[in-house]
Regions:
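Short amphipathic alpha-helix used as the core "switch/output" element in two-component signaling
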Residues: 64-76
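Proline-centered flexible-loop/turn and helix-kink motifs
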Residues: 26-27, 49, 75
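Active-site residues of response regulator receiver
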Residues: 55, 83
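Short hydrophobic/Thr-rich beta-strand motif most characteristic of the beta2 strand and flanking loop
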Residues: 27-35, 43
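Acidic catalytic/metal-coordinating carboxylates
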Residues: 36-39, 61-65
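Active-site beta3 strand of CheY-like receiver
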Residues: 47-53
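Conserved acidic segment of CheY-like receiver
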Residues: 2-14, 18-22, 52
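Receiver (REC) domain active-site loop signature in two-component systems and cognate sites
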Residues: 58
Length: 84
């Protein structure tokens, strides 16, 4: 079964590195990226994803606020919070 993954982090270097790692994993496909919580929430209505890797510390909406709003709309999402 293929896992469709979205990356949400304000640091493009981190998103690029994580995407590179995930693309080497069998059964994983990165289907979207967002540089902010607001950008992620805007893409949520049409998003087909199973898992979200979410940065905790972002400007604007942080990871906790974004996760709360996302799960209110899509309780089926699995969100993994990251911080560096």
């Amino acid at each position: 079964m293929e896992r469709k993954i979205v990356l949400v982090d304000d640091h493009s270097l981190f998103r690029n590195g994580l995407r590179g790692l995930l693309e080497r994993c069998a059964g994983c496909r990165v289907v979207g990226e967002a540089a902010s919580g607001e950008e992620f929430l805007a893409m949520l209505p049409g998003l087909e994803a199973d898992v979200v890797f979410m940065d905790f510390a972002m400007p604007g909406l942080d990871g906790a606020q974004t996760t709360e709003r996302a799960l209110a709309r899509r309780p089926d999402l699995r969100i993994i919070t990251l911080s560096m």
